[in-house]
Amino acid sequence: MPARKSSLALFLLGAALTGMVWRPLGAAMLVYNLLSIVLFWKLICRHCRHLGTRSCPCGYGVLAARYFKGIPGSDFRKIFRKNIAIMYPCWFIPFAAGVYLLLARYSRGILLLFAAFVVVGFIVIPFISRFAGCKGCSLKSECPWMSSGRAAADV
C-alpha cells in the first residue's frame, strides 16, 4: 500500500534527521514513530467503520483489527480530531531538527535529506491521501482530513 510505504519513508527520514542532531534522539524518534502508529490504531482506528476491512485508506483496517476491537457507534470525526495530534511529532520534530541542521551544520547531504523528508511528509503523503487512498472512502464526509473546513466548524 503506497500510504504505508510513504509513512515508513517519512519515519526513517525523520529518524535520520533527528539522529544527526543527537543519536539517542534519532533512536527515540524511531521508537515514537512506531508507537504512534499503534496508538493511532488504538485511539482512532477502533472507531472507524473500516476496521477489519481492506477498504481502509491508510491500510491499517485489517492490521489494527488484529490487536484492537472496534467501538461501533462512535463519532469518528470527533475522535479523529481529538487524537490525531499523536502523529504531529512524527512530522514536526524531524522538521525542526532539519531546520536546526541546515542552520548549524549546513551540508549538501543534510539539505537533500531534509528536502526528501519535506517532499515525502508534506507533499507525497497528503497527495496519496487526498487523491488515492481517501478518494473513494465512504467516510470522507465524516473525516476531518478530507473535509477539514467543515469539520473544524462542526467540532
Stretches found by the model and what they are:
Residues M1-S36, M87-V119:
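Long, highly hydrophobic alpha-helical transmembrane signal-anchor segments
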Residues R23-L51, V120-S129:
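Hydrophobic alpha-helical membrane-embedded segments
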Residues C45-L51, C56, C134-C137, C143:
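Short cysteine clusters
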Residues T53-L63, E142-R150:
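Membrane-cytosol interface motif
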Residues C56-K82:
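Short membrane-interface loop/juxtamembrane segments of multi-pass integral membrane proteins
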Residues Y106-S148:
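Alpha-helical transmembrane segments and their immediate juxtamembrane interface regions
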Residues V155:
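Polar-ligand-bearing catalytic/cofactor-coordination segments
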